[in-house]
Every structure is written in C-alpha cells, then in structure tokens.
C-alpha cells in the first residue's frame, strides 16, 4: 500500500467528506430509492434510475475516500523547519516578468487548490521549488510558456 503525504487540514477535510457521504448522503439516497420504488414500475421510472446512479457514484466516492484515508501519511507542517523548500512549505515568490507576488503552500495531490494557494507536490512549480531556498530563482515551463520566479520567502506554518 503506497502512502502519500498530506497535511493535517487536508486529512480532516477528507474524513469530513467521508463522514458526510456515509452519514448524510447515503441515507438520503436510500430514502430516494425507496420513494421512487413506491411509484411502481421500475423499468420506466426515471427517479429510481437517477437515485440508483447517485447511489453508485456516492458508493464509489466512499470507497475512494476510505482508500485515501487509509494511505495518507499525515505530516504536521508546523513541526517542520529548515532553509530548503520541501513538502508543507509556504513559499513566497516574485514573477520576474510581471513583478507579481505569489504565495503557495506545497501540499499533497488530494488537497491541492490553486485558488486557495495550495499546489500539488507533483505540479511543475512545486517540483521546481523542492530543494531550493530564499534568493534562488526557478524556471517553470508552463502551457503559456516559460516563467521565472525569485523565491523571496519560505516558512512552515
């Protein structure tokens, strides 16, 4: 069983979604199936088929979440330190073309959300950042072309 890194916050979100799907969504879908079944002929019962499909999707996601929870290796970022970028680091960098400041935390694949400033450890930017430190410059090949960033801050929070 291959483990993957995850922050405590990301792990809690996974467990929260799993609980919701098991304790709220599953009973709601079962009730919808029972209600649709009460309408009679199942062969042409769109409500029944929609509820069964929702059940299948929900159970699939529950299985996926159970697997992720079992394989997660929780890394408490607040206990990390150092002057080199690694998993969990929050990095401040300046785009050398636009002088725009960007702040990203490097997290596990399952908890990445660029809009929230969390990038996957397997993303091109994170791969370029790993092992670097303040003052270093990285080059990232993105779909829109190559970008250069100067690392101006590094912390573990």
UniProtKB/Swiss-Prot annotation:
Keywords: DNA-binding, Transcription, Transcription regulation
HAMAP family: GreA_GreB
GO biological process: DNA-templated transcription elongation; regulation of DNA-templated transcription elongation
One Pfam family named in its UniProt record: GreA_GreB
Family that this chain belongs to: Belongs to the GreA/GreB family.
Function: Necessary for efficient RNA polymerase transcription elongation past template-encoded arresting sites. The arresting sites in DNA have the property of trapping a certain fraction of elongating RNA polymerases that pass through, resulting in locked ternary complexes. Cleavage of the nascent transcript by cleavage factors such as GreA or GreB allows the resumption of elongation from the new 3'terminus. GreA releases sequences of 2 to 3 nucleotides.
Keyword Transcription regulation annotated: yes
Gene3D superfamilies, alphabetized: Transcription elongation factor, GreA/GreB, C-terminal domain, Transcription elongation factor, GreA/GreB, N-terminal domain
Keyword Transcription: yes
Protein's UniProt name: Transcription elongation factor GreA
GO molecular function, one term: DNA binding
């Amino acid at each position: 069983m291959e483990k993957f890194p995850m922050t405590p916050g990301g792990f809690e979100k996974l467990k929260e979604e799993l609980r919701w799907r098991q304790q709220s969504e599953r009973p709601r879908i079962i009730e919808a199936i029972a209600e649709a079944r009460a309408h009679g002929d199942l062969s042409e019962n769109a409500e029944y088929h929609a509820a069964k499909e929702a059940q299948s999707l929900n159970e699939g996601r529950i299985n996926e979440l159970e697997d992720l929870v079992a394989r997660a290796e929780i890394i408490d970022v607040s206990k990390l330190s150092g002057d080199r970028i690694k998993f969990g680091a929050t990095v401040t960098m300046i785009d050398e073309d636009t002088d725009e400041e960007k702040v990203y935390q490097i997290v596990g694949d399952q908890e990445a959300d660029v809009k929230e400033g969390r990038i996957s450890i397997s993303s091109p930017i994170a791969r370029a950042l790993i092992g670097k430190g303040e003052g270093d410059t990285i080059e990232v090949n993105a779909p829109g072309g190559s970008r250069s960033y100067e690392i101006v801050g590094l912390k573990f929070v």
